[in-house]
Each structure stands twice: as structure tokens, then as C-alpha cells.
Regions:
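Generic enzyme active-site microenvironment
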Residues: 31, 144, 290
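A conserved beta-strand/loop capping segment in the N-terminal third of enzymes
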Residues: 49-100
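Extreme N-terminal starter segment of soluble prokaryotic enzymes
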Residues: 2-6
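FAD/FMN-dependent oxidoreductases across multiple families
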Residues: 117, 136, 214-318, 324-326
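Glycine-rich FAD pyrophosphate-binding loop
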Residues: 7, 11, 21-42
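C-terminal helical "tail/cap" subdomain of flavin- and related membrane-associated enzymes
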Residues: 317-401
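Predominantly flavin-linked oxidoreductase catalytic cores and closely associated redox partners
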Residues: 11, 25, 102-243, 295
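N-terminal Rossmann-fold NAD(P) dinucleotide-binding loop
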Residues: 15-16
């Protein structure tokens, strides 16, 4: 039997980074990567400036650095943001491969086999798992880093209710024939959530993120197609018509082209409610959950890569110090407050304010006020948290325009 100190199921950012840090610290680590080779994670691929500053080695992965972004209100009003601190957009194939290779180079055993939670069994010395190819491995600690649909997470911490999940779906489409493609985030009209267009080195990732309990596939898919067509067609004014149903020959030709060339994807994202954070337990004496498997994603934006990497780092520090159960208190102290505050803000962020969507008013105000615009840019880039967001916005708004 193959024996290890830790068995990590899932080789996304959380699992691979944990494997790297633990192996560097002297632990014997098995990292199980059950995803078919070349199959990308369904994700926009955005990595915040906060993450890039915390782990500058991420800049060595092949990606695109973003210094400016166009933010659109539900009615189509545009706010152009020039970011003080850039963020990056990666192909998840390239990004995940980069982190997995670092884990392997650090001494972790990377095993390209799928693991079912049903085949993970507790023993007197820890855990035994049997892979899809009937290979058997044992370890003292079992780590679930297998994403939002985590089978390990359901086994160890229980299933999350649908209200604690979000849905993201979209298309990978060709880059425009000419010009520099803009990075765009557009808040949805009459829906919770937003659409995005994230240019990567060889394609554009289009998508929509919304809550699972509000999800209706056909109307949202229609909305995404309107957004995609509006993205490729040049705007006639500063108010881009993303959400209009265009039937002119140019739009129809573009639709046919995208139907033939675009590749669809879909995923679930954790978006835990405030009350869930009060009771959710994500580690024990011989197990722990990381990243999306633990529920660590921003409930407002769905961003999870920073929390995947940070949870991996916090867990590795606890384990290497011989205090694995400290992980529960450490993550709550480190970033739990931000996640809870985001959960509390989600309804208001996508609610109404002064007779219009809050996102509409926010962009209107930022278009006329440099201080508010700067804070909004910091929020988008990941440098501005939610805990002191209200105070920062009020302070900026009171300063002269």
C-alpha cells in the first residue's frame, strides 16, 4: 500500500498550493488530480491584485495582466476604471498546471486518478482511499480540495443547501479580429449577478454568475448572448446596448459565427449565507476542507482563487506546526470576517437604492466622483474589503469631487 502523511483530493489552486507548501515543509503528500487532461475548470480565471501581491510567483504563470476595466450598470452606463494595482486573467488549464507542477517539483506525488468520496474510509491510523483504477492509498489526514461540488466535503461536513450556492455559466469564444479587447463587467438588469468578458491570451471567457435559487437557464442564456453580441459590435454611444435583442444582419451573422465557434461551460460556486458561516465546520483531528470545497468564495462576486490559496496556506502552517485543529480558528480570524460581511451585503448590493438598483446608483455616483471611483476600482481589483467598505465610501464621498 502507498502510505502518505496527507491525501489531498483535488488539484485545483487550493489542493496544489497546499501540496506544495506541505511537501516543502517535509510532509509526504499525495495529490489526486481526477480531472481529464486538458479539461479546464469552468471559471472566469480572474486573480485579484491582492492575491498577486501575496504570492508574486503567480505572475510567472501565462496570463494577461489587466490595468483597466469597463464596468456597466444594468441600464448600460459605463464606468471606465484605471486600476492602481492590476489583476490578472488566466486560462485555468495554464494556471492549474502551473500550480500542480510547483507541487510536484516540491516533492508531492501527483496522481492522475479520480477519487470518489464513497471510497474514502476511516481506519485506526487515519484514512484509506481507493481510486477509480482500484489503486489503494493510505494517509493520516484527508484533505478535500475538490471544488464546490465536493464529495469529500459532503462526507465530512455535510451538504450545503441550494440557497448557499451560485451558478456560473458561459462560453469561451474567439478574440476579436482587431483591436485590444476590453475587460468588461456588466451588472444584470432585473437579475441578481453580473456578466463578464475576460480576454485571455488566446480567447475570451464570457459568463454570467447568479444565485442558484434565482437561476433560470433559458432567459439568462438569452441575456448572455445579447451581452456577447453587444461586446463584439462597436458601441454607438457611451451607453452600450448590451441587453437589447438585435436582429439586424450584422448581429445575426455574428450570432451564427459564435454558435459555431464558442465552447460552453458551467459550474457551481459557493455563496454561503451569514448564518451558515456560524455553524459550518471545515476541519477535524484528521481532515480539513480547502477553497471552494470549504465554501470559501466571495458571496457578492463569486471570486474564490484568493481564498483557495489563502486557506491552503493557513492550513499548511497549522499542520506543519502540529496544530491541525487550529485551522478552524485561524481561517475565521484571517478572512472569515470578510466572507461573513460579504454574505451580509449581498442582498443589499443587488437590491434597490433610491428607486433604482444599487449597482446603477453606485456607477452613476462613481462617474461623477473621483474618490468613490477610486474605492470602487480597489474593490474590483481585490484591494478593498467589505468590512470597512461603507466607512471608506462615506469618507470618499464627503471629500470634494
Amino acid at each position: 500500500m502507498n502510505r502518505f502523511d496527507l491525501l489531498i483530493v483535488g488539484a485545483g489552486p487550493a489542493g496544489s498550493f497546499a501540496a506544495e507548501l506541505l511537501a516543502k515543509g517535509g510532509a509526504k503528500v499525495a495529490l489526486f488530480d481526477g480531472r481529464p487532461e486538458g479539461e479546464p475548470k469552468a471559471c472566469g480565471g480572474g486573480v485579484t491584485s491582492k492575491a498577486l501581491k501575496a504570492w508574486p510567483q503567480l505572475l510567472n504563470a501565462v496570463g494577461r495582466t489587466i490595468n483597466e476595466l469597463d464596468l456597466y450598470s444594468p441600464s448600460g452606463k459605463k464606468l471606465h476604471l484605471e486600476l492602481d494595482e492590476p489583476f490578472a486573467i488566466y486560462s485555468r488549464i495554464a494556471f492549474d498546471s502551473f500550480l500542480r507542477d510547483r507541487a510536484r517539483d516540491s516533492g508531492a506525488a501527483v496522481i492522475g486518478e479520480k477519487v470518489s468520496a464513497r471510497k474514502a474510509k476511516r481506519t485506526h491510523g487515519g484514512w484509506t482511499i481507493i481510486t477509480e483504477n482500484n489503486s489503494e492509498y493510505s494517509g493520516h489526514v484527508l484533505i478535500g480540495a475538490d471544488g464546490a461540488n465536493s464529495g469529500i466535503g459532503k462526507k465530512l461536513a455535510g451538504a450545503l443547501p441550494p440557497s448557499d450556492m451560485e451558478v456560473a455559466f458561459g462560453y469561451r469564444a474567439p478574440l476579436p479580429a482587431s483591436g485590444e479587447p476590453p475587460t468588461v463587467v456588466a451588472f444584470l438588469p432585473k437579475w441578481v449577478g453580473y456578466a463578464w468578458a475576460f480576454p485571455r491570451p488566446d480567447h475570451i471567457s464570457f459568463g454570467i454568475a447568479t444565485t442558484q435559487d434565482a437561476f433560470e437557464h433559458q432567459p439568462l442564456d438569452d441575456l448572455l448572448w445579447q451581452f456577447m453580441i453587444g461586446y463584439y459590435l462597436p458601441p454607438s454611444t457611451d451607453k452600450r446596448k448590451f441587453w437589447s435583442q438585435r436582429k439586424d444582419p450584422q448581429a445575426e451573422n455574428l450570432r451564427r459565427y459564435l454558435q459555431q465557434s464558442a465552447e460552453r461551460y458551467a459550474a457551481r460556486i459557493p455563496g454561503l449565507a451569514d448564518k451558515t458561516w456560524e455553524t459550518r465546520k471545515i476541519c477535524g483531528l484528521d481532515w480539513a476542507l480547502l477553497g471552494d470545497a470549504a465554501g470559501f468564495a466571495d458571496p457578492v462576486t463569486g471570486e474564490g482563487i484568493y481564498y483557495a490559496l489563502r486557506s491552503a496556506q493557513v492550513f499548511a502552517e497549522c499542520h506543519l506546526a502540529g496544530k491541525i485543529t487550529d485551522y478552524e480558528a485561524r481561517w475565521r480570524e484571517d478572512f472569515g470576517g470578510e466572507l461573513r460581511r460579504a454574505a451580509q451585503m449581498r442582498r443589499r448590493f443587488y437590491g434597490n437604492f433610491w428607486g433604482a438598483p444599487f449597482t446603477e446608483r453606485m456607477i452613476e455616483f462613481a462617474r461623477g466622483h473621483r474618490g468613490v471611483k477610486r474605492v470602487l476600482g480597489e474593490l474590483v481589483a481585490g484591494d478593498q474589503g467589505y468590512v470597512d467598505l461603507k466607512k471608506k465610501l462615506v469618507r470618499s464621498a464627503l471629500r470634494p469631487i
